[in-house]
């Protein structure tokens, strides 16, 4: 397959202009028809207010065709296959000559045309299992992104997985979360962290990754999301996102598919113990978080998809002697700007409709700490994402339209064992300490503060131009009392640095 990179057009171009650009890049004759699909689309705003769309497209076929009118009245002049009816395409395939990739490359003389392989991810278990024994059914703990995809792949292989999720189904979970955001009591088993779809369901559904993908896993994930309800544009848009509102539909559809294939998804069911005999798993102990009843299920294979915040499960696994390794992380706060401000910085008043802009900023302090933006939510909301009593954590989310008044992003600082101490779970205890500080500073609500007051180490008394867009109760507090001197000084230094990239950022 051929891929044509760096096709650059004004952002408000027509489909016909893209067709023509592909035709020109390949140097096709007027009687040659090319079939292509968009592989990637990104925005080039380096020359704002002139904004460009930059494409990579995959060429599937190029044919020589008679210069006759098609049934729709158009001419055979290199337009993509979508312009040709299925019956007419079949006629062309049978009657006309396909042009080889080598000939196209040779005559195009275009360094942006390369040969690529269409890599498709293959699940290791390809043989459909029949009549699998009950004790051989794999058990999946957690129904966030990892658990959902594990269960789906296992179900498609005929292995009839059993999924235990400590939180609620998405419909019940949304009700529980809304009650909490409106001032109700936190449900420590079903909240923004726990429940069907995992934490990502209440975090916009950003699908960014910087890892290499030699086996095609990333596109397999994107294809799967589209199959269950996501917009097809996530297959090619740079920095794709789904939106919290659409994710709720997708996770339900995936669950129903798993059940339809013979799997089970059991909610309100927390892993409390794992029994191991001679180095082999023999049972899982599951507690119903609503009734308190406990079951012991015999099993041989367990997939732990427990996410970031199941801290009680981490400790249970450590007590049972499972090998664990600490992972570096970063901590910080959420920063809100008017989305119009971020848009203007990105597009400088471009005269056509553009997506809500995002940003990415990084900085290294004089002391060597890294400070950077993370999980940026255009047109989004800050949400109370707490999962333990007496602690406060926040996250960011956007709906599919990304049409909220404010943009928000985490501004976070790298931390090391010098900050939180040695021990495989020392970082977990450090997180808990910070969340307790936040809870105390906000008197049980989310503490908020103007950046100017944060710099001066004082509590704000009113809002300026930016009014918070927050899901959950909030009150004025001082973030210096939450993160401590070292981390706050790093953020303050970085904010001044960010202002050089985005004027007015701080």
Roles of regions detected by a PLM:
Residues 2-50, 59-69, 73, 77-506:
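Residues forming the flavin
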Residues 54-56:
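N-terminal membrane-anchoring/stem segments of glycan-assembly enzymes
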């Amino acid at each position: 397959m051929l891929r044509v990179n760096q096709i650059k057009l004004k952002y408000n171009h027509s489909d016909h202009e893209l067709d023509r650009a592909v035709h020109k890049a390949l140097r096709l004759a007027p009687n040659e028809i090319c079939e292509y699909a968009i592989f990637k689309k990104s925005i080039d705003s380096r020359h704002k207010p002139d904004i460009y769309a930059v494409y990579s497209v995959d060429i599937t076929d190029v044919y020589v065709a008679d210069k006759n009118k098609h049934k729709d009245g158009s001419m055979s002049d290199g337009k993509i296959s979508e312009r040709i009816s299925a019956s007419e395409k079949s006629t062309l395939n049978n009657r006309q000559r396909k042009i080889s990739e080598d000939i196209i490359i040779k005559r195009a003389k275009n360094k942006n045309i390369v040969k690529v392989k269409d890599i498709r991810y293959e699940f290791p278990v390809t043989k459909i299992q029949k009549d699998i024994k009950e004790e051989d059914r794999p058990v999946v703990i957690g129904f966030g992104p990892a658990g959902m995809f594990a269960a789906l792949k296992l179900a498609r292989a005929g292995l009839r997985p059993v999924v235990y999720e400590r939180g609620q189904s998405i419909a019940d979970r949304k009700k529980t979360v809304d009650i909490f955001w409106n001032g109700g009591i936190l449900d420590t088993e079903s909240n923004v962290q726990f429940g069907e779809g995992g934490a990502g369901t209440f975090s916009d559904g950003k699908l960014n990754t910087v890892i290499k993908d030699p086996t095609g896993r990333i596109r397999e994930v994107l294809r799967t999301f589209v199959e269950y309800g996501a917009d097809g544009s996530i297959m090619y848009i740079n920095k794709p996102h789904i939106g919290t509102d659409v994710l709720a539909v997708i996770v339900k559809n995936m669950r129903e598919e798993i059940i339809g294939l013979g799997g089970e998804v059991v909610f309100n069911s927390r892993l409390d113990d794992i029994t191991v005999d001679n180095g082999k798993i023999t049972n899982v102990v599951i507690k119903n978080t609503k009734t308190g009843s406990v079951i012991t299920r015999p099993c041989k294979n367990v997939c732990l998809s427990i996410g970031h915040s199941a801290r009680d499960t981490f400790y249970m696994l450590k007590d049972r002697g499972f090998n664990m390794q600490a992972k570096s992380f970063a901590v910080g706060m959420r920063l809100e700007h008017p989305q119009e401000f971020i848009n203007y910085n990105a597009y400088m008043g471009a005269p056509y409709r553009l997506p809500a802009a995002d940003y990415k900023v990084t900085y290294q302090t004089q002391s060597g700490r890294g400070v950077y933006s993370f999980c940026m939510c255009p047109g989004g909301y800050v949400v109370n994402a707490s999962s333990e009593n007496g602690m406060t954590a926040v996250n960011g989310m956007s709906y599919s339209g990304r049409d909220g008044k404010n943009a928000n992003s985490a501004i976070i600082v790298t931390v090391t064992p010098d900050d939180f101490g040695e021990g495989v779970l020392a970082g977990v205890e450090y997180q808990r300490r910070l969340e307790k500080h936040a809870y105390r500073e906000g008197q049980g609500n989310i503490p908020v503060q103007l950046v100017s007051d944060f710099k001066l180490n004082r509590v704000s008394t009113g809002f300026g131009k930016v009014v918070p867009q927050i899901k959950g109760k909030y009150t004025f507090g001082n973030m210096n009392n939450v993160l401590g001197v070292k981390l706050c000084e790093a953020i303050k230094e970085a904010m001044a640095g960010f202002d050089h990239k985005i004027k007015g950022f701080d």
